[in-house]
Each structure stands twice: as structure tokens, then as C-alpha cells.
Amino acid sequence: MTNDSASRTPSDNTELTEMQRYVTQQRGTEPAFSGKLLHNKRTGVYHCLCCQAPLFYSDSKYDSGCGWPSFDQPVSSEAVRYLEDDSHNMRRIEIRCGQCDAHLGHVFPDGPKTTGERYCVNSASLSFIDDVDGERVDG
């Protein structure tokens, strides 16, 4: 796995927006309640914006009220990787794309009863592909 974050771009070779670059390459966080995919209710799959690896199914998304898209589990155990994050004087678990290492967000142990986990993900790190019409929406 490479750590050359400056060379990563979305799979269609378009440029990352400033916010997408900040989130995925610099471990940033978009402002709460600002993400394009926060209120998305369509059926489909959420992919990594940078490499298009599948990350979360829409049926695992729920409204946690935290201001970022929340999921109770990834599509597979290999979809995301976990790192300890002690930044900002907090102990958290960072989640990154299991394929390209792009920063996604964090996972917390306060999720729904199904898994007990809340994957709190920045919209700017995701692409959504609709199951019905195949439309792709980048966060």
C-alpha cells in the first residue's frame, strides 16, 4: 500500500475539490451538516471518492443526528482499515479506505443495537452510486 497521498485523485481523473483533498488527503473534517450525501435516502452503494472501492451499503446508513453520514457497518472487513487517532486531545479510531488509504472519518462505539458501531464518515470522502439509475454523486 502506498502512502503517496499527493498523487491520489478520483478514478475518473478529475481533480479533487479543496474540501475533498482536505478530507481525504490531509485527514480533515468537513463542517457538520454540510455534506452533500448527509440526507441522501436513495438505494445504492457508497464508494471511496479516490479509488471507487465499495465501502458502505445504503441499508447500513442511518440518521445519528451527528451531522455526518453514519453507517453501522462497512461492506466487508477489508473495506476499511482502522488506526488509533490521539489528535485534538481525544482518543478515537480513524477509518481509512482499505484500498487506497484515503481518510474517511472515525468509528465510535455508540451506534445502533445491530452492531453497536457508528461509522461517522465525511461526505467529501464518498461517491454514491444509485442502484436504480446508476447515477454517481460525489460528496
Curated annotation (Swiss-Prot):
GO terms for cellular component: cytoplasm. Zn(2+) binds at C48, C51, C97, C100. The active site is at C120. Binds 1 zinc ion per subunit. The zinc ion is important for the structural integrity of the protein. It holds the Pfam family SelR. It comes from the Bacteria. Transmembrane segments: none annotated. Its EC number is 1.8.4.12. Keywords: Metal-binding, Oxidoreductase, Zinc. PROSITE patterns: MSRB. It catalyses: L-methionyl-[protein] + [thioredoxin]-disulfide + H2O = L-methionyl-(R)-S-oxide-[protein] + [thioredoxin]-dithiol. Its cofactor is Zn(2+). GO terms for molecular function: peptide-methionine (R)-S-oxide reductase activity; zinc ion binding. GO terms for biological process: protein repair; response to oxidative stress. Residues 9-131 form the MsrB domain. Belongs to the MsrB Met sulfoxide reductase family. This is Peptide methionine sulfoxide reductase MsrB. It comes from Pectobacterium carotovorum subsp. carotovorum (strain PC1).
